Amino acid sequence: MQQSPTAGKIINCKAAVAWQPAAPLSIENVQVFPPRVHEVRIKIVNSGVCHTDAYTLSGKDPEGLFPVILGHEGAGIVESVGPQVTTVQVGDPVIALYTPECKTCKFCKSGKTNLCGRIRTTQGKGLMPDGTSRFSCNGNTLLHFMGCSTFSEYTVVADISVVAIERLAPLDSVCLLGCGITTGYGAATITADIKEGDSVAVFGLGSVGLAVIQGAVKKRAGRIFGIDVNPEKKNWAMSFGATDFINPNDLQSPIQDVLIHETDGGLDWTFDCTGNVHVMRSALEACHKGWGQSIVIGVAAAGQEISTRPFQLVTGRVWRGCAFGGVKGRSQLPDLVKEYLDHKLEIDKYITHRRPLKEINEAFTDMHNGNCIKTVLSIP
């Protein structure tokens, strides 16, 4: 196996550091230590900016820890590997995975979920599996984020949290498969496994919601409703294949009542991509009695709870949720990269903004503007 000239050495590089919540990120010189057993060091080339990053930075995330290097939607090149790593090699183009896949824990072996349990405890603490960090800045230990930390020129991840992809794949596009697009597309094609002719409603038309629409089209759904309070999202929804667009602010009746009327009793599938618990209830209650299912994708704020009348469930509606669209990162993500290369999966259309790492705070501002779907960072 070839070796990088920096293998086994501490690398000094640039990273965007979140020193404290609700404060701008700071571009710093950081030290990235060599990978240990079953670890991989990656030269990050591109990273998307996700609402989950903003949520943690806001201080509203009860599991948010500081100081930390955020970012979890990145692609790059393997710089070096630690002992006992066999899944990737130096020079491989890769995507970092915030949802790992060890293939040996009870979750992975069950075949029922993509939620690997192998490193969940340490990942939630912002640490590598051995309980330590690979980042330092000015003598301060920096924490990892979601097992990825892609807002850095170099990062270290567990070998079960990275997957090699085809060398022809442009990293400034496929980096977005590290979270949002995969989450929405997988929710439609894997978690729901929509059948031809099924009726679908998607609440919230950011990148995740638009990806749900793309997945529904892939599965040959019938009527596809895009729902958003931003009227500018209508053109986006229709361009990805929605058949209808509804702005709840334009209605005199609750959105669920309108959808039930429009679909002769309710929808086969609804998807919440907002993280708003009131919208989650509307999405469930818009489902058809007897078989309609609502998939919760959006993450609600701390302390929020969902509620509905039990009769909604007794009469056959189902509430479900998914992370990363139900996609198994190491087993299935390379297939999505191939779909993109074969022009069967759209990625580039989502990219409305591109910025260098030094403009990361502006990228966070972009994200909250109604005309931004996805920003891709070039690193450094």
UniProtKB/Swiss-Prot annotation:
InterPro entries in UniProt: ADH-like_C, ADH-like_N, ADH_3, ADH_Zn_CS, GroES-like_sf, NAD(P)-bd_dom_sf
UniProt binding sites for Zn(2+) 1: 50, 72-73, 179
SUPFAM superfamilies tied to this protein: GroES-like, NAD(P)-binding Rossmann-fold domains
Pfam families attached to this UniProt entry: ADH_N, ADH_zinc_N
Recorded GO MF terms: alcohol dehydrogenase (NAD+) activity; hydroxymethylfurfural reductase (NADH) activity; S-(hydroxymethyl)glutathione dehydrogenase (NAD+) activity; S-(hydroxymethyl)glutathione dehydrogenase (NADP+) activity; S-(hydroxymethyl)glutathione dehydrogenase [NAD(P)+] activity; S-nitrosoglutathione reductase (NADH) activity; zinc ion binding
Cofactor list: Zn(2+)
EC identifiers of the protein: 1.1.1.284, 1.1.1.1, 1.1.1.-
Catalyses which reaction(s): a primary alcohol + NAD(+) = an aldehyde + NADH + H(+); a secondary alcohol + NAD(+) = a ketone + NADH + H(+); S-(hydroxymethyl)glutathione + NADP(+) = S-formylglutathione + NADPH + H(+); S-(hydroxymethyl)glutathione + NAD(+) = S-formylglutathione + NADH + H(+)
PROSITE patterns per record: ADH_ZINC
Positions contributing to NAD(+) binding: 51, 204-209, 228, 297-299
UniProt-listed Gene3D superfamilies: Medium-chain alcohol dehydrogenases, catalytic domain, NAD(P)-binding Rossmann-like Domain
Cofactor stoichiometry and binding remark: Binds 2 Zn(2+) ions per subunit.
Residues that coordinate or bind Zn(2+) 2: 102, 105, 108, 116
Keywords for the protein's UniProt record, in alphabetical order: Metal-binding, NAD, Oxidoreductase, Zinc
One cellular component (GO) term of this entry: mitochondrion
Gene Ontology annotations of biological process type: amino acid catabolic process to alcohol via Ehrlich pathway; formaldehyde catabolic process
Protein family: Belongs to the zinc-containing alcohol dehydrogenase family. Class-III subfamily.
Function: Oxidizes long-chain alcohols and, in the presence of glutathione, is able to oxidize formaldehyde. Also acts as a S-nitroso-glutathione reductase by catalyzing the NADH-dependent reduction of S-nitrosoglutathione, thereby regulating protein S-nitrosylation.
UniProt name for this protein: Putative S-(hydroxymethyl)glutathione dehydrogenase 2
Organism of origin: Schizosaccharomyces pombe (strain 972 / ATCC 24843)
